[in-house]
């Protein structure tokens, strides 16, 4: 239902901006997956087939598909607005219902906990004598079983720990390789851009600020161990920022172009890794 609401919102914007009755499936998917609400809720990205199924269900016998574009027939903008409000109200009712249900379960859980505690208190005295008697009578037989259990448990525990440890090591190694590939791809692509290369090399000539030179040494970046993607992006962002420091105001436009190239590269590699 929530996907339905989001798709209608994107569809409404696309049709309103294009002033036609056609909309690209790719633009619908991109608009949906880049939507602020979608990113905030962290739901899964939508696929083309999902979009087609939802469109057919919401607009039966009103669409046709040709060359990756959906054409809408006899569709008015206010019709989409009405559908958006209808889905919004259904979502609202659904959420209110879920909250009411959760509230009842919480109240029921508290009452059950109180009654359970009271019954345990009444039964504790009567059960203690019988349990101690049975413990004495079964002592000899239980001793052997307990000894076996105690001896076998550490072995099983050690085996489980070893397996978990090897899985964690494998995942760390795999993640490290992916991050290194990301780092190499980003730097290689950035080196092909003229503006970024000029900004990057400009502060290498600045002798009075060793900190800037060390933080932005390209050779150092190529061997940088990444904990996450933000580490690399932060270092590259420093490059553009420090480029302004070393150039002054005359080359601000060039630095802004370099910033655009950086943003484009980061998005390019992220999309490549996502797909």
From Swiss-Prot:
Keywords: Chromatin regulator, DNA damage, DNA repair, Nucleus, Transcription, Transcription regulation
InterPro entries in alphabetical order: EAF5
Keyword Transcription regulation in annotation: yes
Gene Ontology CC entries for this record: nucleus
Ranges annotated as biased composition (Low complexity): 115-166
Residue numbers spanned by region Disordered: 107-169
GO BP, sorted A to Z: chromatin organization; DNA repair
Subcellular location: Nucleus
Top-level taxon in the UniProt lineage: Eukaryota
Function description: Component of the NuA4 histone acetyltransferase complex which is involved in transcriptional activation of selected genes principally by acetylation of nucleosomal histone H4 and H2A. The NuA4 complex is also involved in DNA repair.
UniProt subunit comment: Component of the NuA4 histone acetyltransferase complex.
Similarity-based family: Belongs to the EAF5 family.
Name of the protein in its database record: Chromatin modification-related protein EAF5
Organism field: Kluyveromyces lactis (strain ATCC 8585 / CBS 2359 / DSM 70799 / NBRC 1267 / NRRL Y-1140 / WM37) (Yeast)
Gene behind this protein: EAF5
